[in-house]
């Protein structure tokens, strides 16, 4: 009897090792694939809505998701950043001729919403791609919300995928959990945000000690590069995260004027050179990698697919070359993410985005199409393919 118990325990142990061996880990300050025993270059797009496509009962939505992943794989993307537990609440409009608007509700733990993530993770696994899963959209410092966050984490991370039989906390197709997807706080609230992230990390670690944990961080232009790098280092150390995702949105953060998105690029590049160099120095010594998430608007703030994106393409080319340079020099910047992928989404025949479920990288309460990279944006797609394949 004891012998059979020993064999059973051994098999369970081996199974756990198998799951652990497929995880992406930190090794000497680098993202490391324990299966291939090699470093990982982080080449990502934000596609928050991917689980919604997978959960839809409309077969065309699932077909779109499959085709989007095929396109991303062809471009060279290996990570898709998504949002967990999401539901769209439709908001009626006063004008009956208009389609309903929508808002995003998060921390939804009903079983039906696991269906989409189950499907997505299975499709990513088929393509040797990974998911980075945000557990909420934005940071919310309300204590009641924090309690709900903890309940959601417990339920979500212990869910068993109906297609693969693997519990999420053991699933190697998940590269990391991200505390939240967006950062909407001012500099004065940074200490509160740091405490909140620390609490969230502790909550996640109690359930899952295998996956990496990420959190977003936004540079404060009011500080010089060295001061902001020290702030990033302190934030990483105090929260216990494995990797920071630095959000760079030049127009929204005041790096360039909205009236000079092309003319302002040279000055933007000089500023980012200084910040990235400072980040590399500080983060390398702490043996913690970081990535950058970038977004840039279309020329003249167009919102339709295939409209001119020359400024954005120049910015993406700069960022791609900067990431390649840092990786070759074994610096702390390990990769980048594009916010985000709109893929096959299209407005109506008048060029108006009137359908909430025609998902783009923008949330329903944001200007649809402004930052999205669509399949029809051939020149932008070519730039991304060149930069991603270069690595």
Say what each PLM segment does:
Residues 25-255, 262-281, 285-288, 300-388:
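Active-site mouth of glycoside hydrolases
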Residues 291-297:
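Short acidic/histidine-rich active-site segments
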Residues 17-22:
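Boundary at the C-terminal end of the N-terminal hydrophobic targeting segment
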Residues 4-14:
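Sec-dependent N-terminal signal peptides
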């Amino acid at each position: 009897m004891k012998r059979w118990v020993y064999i059973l325990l051994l098999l369970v142990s081996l199974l756990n090792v198998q799951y652990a061996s497929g995880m992406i880990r930190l090794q000497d300050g680098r993202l490391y694939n324990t299966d291939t025993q090699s470093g990982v270059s982080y080449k990502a797009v934000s596609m928050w809505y991917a689980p919604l496509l997978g959960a839809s009962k409309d077969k065309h939505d699932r077909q779109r998701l499959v085709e989007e992943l095929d396109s991303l794989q062809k471009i060279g993307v290996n990570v898709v950043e998504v949002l967990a537990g999401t539901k769209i609440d439709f908001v009626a409009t006063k004008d009956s001729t208009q389609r309903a608007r929508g808002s995003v509700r998060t921390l939804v733990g009903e079983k039906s919403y696991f269906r989409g993530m189950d499907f997505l993770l299975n499709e990513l696994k088929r393509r040797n791609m990974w998911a980075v899963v945000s557990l909420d959209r934005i940071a919310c410092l309300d204590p009641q919300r924090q309690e709900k966050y903890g309940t959601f984490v417990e339920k979500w991370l212990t869910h068993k995928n109906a297609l693969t039989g693997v519990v999420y906390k053991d699933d190697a197709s998940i590269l990391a959990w991200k505390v939240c997807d967006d950062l909407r706080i001012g500099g004065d609230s940074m200490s509160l945000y740091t405490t909140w992230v620390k609490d969230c990390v502790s909550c996640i670690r109690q359930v899952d000690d295998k996956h990496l944990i990420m959190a977003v961080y936004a540079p404060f232009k009011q500080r010089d590069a060295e001061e902001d790098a020290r702030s990033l280092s302190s934030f990483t150390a105090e929260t216990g995260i494995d990797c920071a995702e630095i959000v760079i949105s030049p127009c929204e953060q005041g790096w360039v004027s909205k009236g000079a998105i092309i003319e302002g690029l040279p000055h933007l590049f000089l500023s980012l050179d200084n910040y990235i160099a400072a980040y590399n120095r500080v983060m390398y010594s702490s043996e913690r990698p970081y990535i950058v998430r970038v977004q840039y608007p279309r020329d003249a703030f167009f919102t339709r697919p295939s409209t001119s994106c020359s400024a954005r393409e120049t910015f993406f080319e700069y960022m791609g070359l900067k990431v390649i340079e840092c990786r070759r020099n074994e610096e702390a910047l390990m990769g980048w993410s594009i916010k985000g992928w709109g893929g096959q989404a299209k407005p109506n025949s008048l060029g108006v985005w009137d359908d909430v479920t025609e998902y783009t990288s923008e949330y329903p309460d944001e200007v649809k199409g402004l930052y999205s990279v669509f399949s029809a944006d051939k020149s932008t797609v070519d730039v991304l393919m060149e930069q991603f394949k270069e690595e």
